[in-house]
Swiss-Prot record:
Protein name: Olfactory receptor 8A1
Sample GO molecular function, one term: G protein-coupled receptor activity
Membrane topology reported for the UniProt record: Multi-pass membrane protein
Job description of the protein: Odorant receptor.
Keyword presence, Transmembrane: yes
Organism: Mus musculus (Mouse)
Disulfide cross-links: C97-C188
Recorded family membership: Belongs to the G-protein coupled receptor 1 family.
GO BP term (any one): G protein-coupled receptor signaling pathway
Source species, domain of life: Eukaryota
Length: 309
């Protein structure tokens, strides 16, 4: 993030989600509620997994890291957005904007790869249950999580470095946070090379991880169909479909944002897609991945009884 640039802009104005004053307070209250639920859900999940030894397994190790990623990348975006709802001047400095972009990309890339690791973990658990403890050793689990964060840090550094090379002559970002495509529209220099590089990098991340998830779930589905018990098959389908819905929502919204030309959709469409993967998905992930799980409910019940008595 030290690339030289000749931009005349020293600060940006964030356009926000809407220009209608009467909607500012309702939206503030809505997103404040979403953010509180996101923080409580993800912090609660991390704490619950840490306090209960029966949840110290690869599956919950990955879930706790997913909760950490969700908590972090929601916190990169939402607090500033909440301030802007009640502020007269929605300003962010050039350094602050690029820092927000960098950390957002770190965690959104990490989310892609964490979902992939979790899909692989479920594949091993369902398709190779006898080898699960051997394959998913503590050393491999730690290595996979370290790889996820390393890819996020490196990928974000490359993409943010590309954005730092652009010259910005306009200061109004038609978005509610500093994202790649809205920033490109403010550049007075050619963005073709940067846009192609970002398209390739984002495409690689999304396509490679989503294909890995799809292949893992294809094998999982094949194994589920071989379950003789209707009750067991129904339970497995229910869990698998919930996970797959969350993955599809995340990849669908990110692909809509990044795997297209920067002029291919309206501002409203871009905002809706962004809201899904920056605020809604981090709120729903603890519910979809964890709180519907009987082991988590049992651990929560034991923890609450331990505190009461």
């Amino acid at each position: 993030m030290t690339a030289e640039n000749q931009s005349t802009v020293t600060e940006f104005i964030l356009g926000g989600l809407t220009n209608r004053p009467e909607l500012q307070l309702p939206l503030f209250l809505l997103f404040l509620g979403i953010y509180v639920v996101t923080m409580v859900g993800n912090l609660g999940m991390i704490t619950l997994i840490g306090l209960n030894s029966q949840l110290h397994t690869p599956m919950y190790f990955f879930l706790s890291n997913l909760s950490l990623v969700d908590l972090c990348y929601s916190s990169v975006i939402t607090p500033k957005m909440l301030i802007n709802f009640v502020s007269q001047r929605n300003l962010i400095s050039y350094v602050g904007c690029m820092s927000q972009l960098y950390f957002f990309l770190v965690f959104v890339i990490a989310e892609c790869y964490m979902l992939t690791v979790m899909a692989y973990d479920r594949y091993v658990a369902i398709c190779q249950p006898l080898l699960y403890n051997i394959i998913m050793s503590p050393a491999l689990c730690s290595l996979l999580v370290a790889f996820v964060y390393a890819v996020g840090l490196i990928g974000s550094a490359i993409e943010t470095g590309l954005m730092l090379k652009l010259n910005y002559c306009e200061d109004l970002i038609s978005h509610y946070f500093c994202d790649i495509l809205p920033l490109m529209k403010l550049s007075c220099s050619s963005t073709y090379d940067v846009e192609m590089a970002v398209f390739f990098l984002a495409g690689f991340d999304i396509i490679v991880t989503s294909l890995t998830v799809l292949i893992s779930y294809a094998f999982i589905l094949s194994s589920i169909l071989r379950i003789s018990s209707n009750e067991g098959r129904s339970k497995a389908f229910s869990t698998c479909s919930s996970h797959f819905a969350a993955v599809g929502l995340f990849y669908g919204s990110t692909a809509f944002m990044y795997l297209k030309p920067s002029t291919a959709s309206s501002l409203a469409q871009e905002n809706v897609a962004s809201v899904f993967y920056t605020t809604v998905i981090p709120m729903f992930n603890p519910l979809i991945y964890s709180l519907r799980n009987k082991e988590v409910k049992t651990a929560l019940d034991k923890t609450l009884r331990r505190k009461v008595f």
